[in-house]
Amino acid sequence: YFEAMLEAPDMAFLGVRGLLMQAIRRDDTREALRLANQADVLRPGTPWVLSKLFELQAGAQQWEAANKTLLQGSGAKNAQTGRRRRAVVALALSEEAAASGDHKQAIKQARAACELDSHLIPALAAHVRHLAAAGQMRKAAKTLLAAWARNPHPDLAAAFGALGGPDEAPLDRVKRFQSLYKARPDDIESRLALAEASLAAS
């Protein structure tokens, strides 16, 4: 039925939509991606098509394509969702760059993810990790302390702990964690992070 609709120019889009929904229901990602791209060619910029295309591309870890889809307008109906999605894509691109040894691109994409969504903890932790991997330890610590002051989180405490390296003396670690505590002394996460560092030193 849907295949027959493809033959009529005025019905082709509806036919592609029907086939796309069938492909999604049977978990045929490759076919669903092909059909979503075809739907976008037939009616460029259709919000539901772009949203579905993004979801499929992200699920297949096609981050460059997902980024292009987002720039084309996915998430435009909800600006916050659009920014969050773009942040997630930037984070994924950051991790890909890091895996290939491109620290500069990894830092750039992680920073972009943080700018798009300052509450995306994995992006903040990745930004710090990539700065440290590039030997920018002071900048990594400064970035993390600023993020901690806004939004204390156990994953940020773990990233801060990793900045000391495996050979850091326990008392030096406690001193470093005191600066984390001072960035947000009123928060329970600050007290927990300092307590854990102190316990490890005793």
Where are these regions (language model features)?
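Repeat-based scaffolding regions
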Residues: Y1-S202
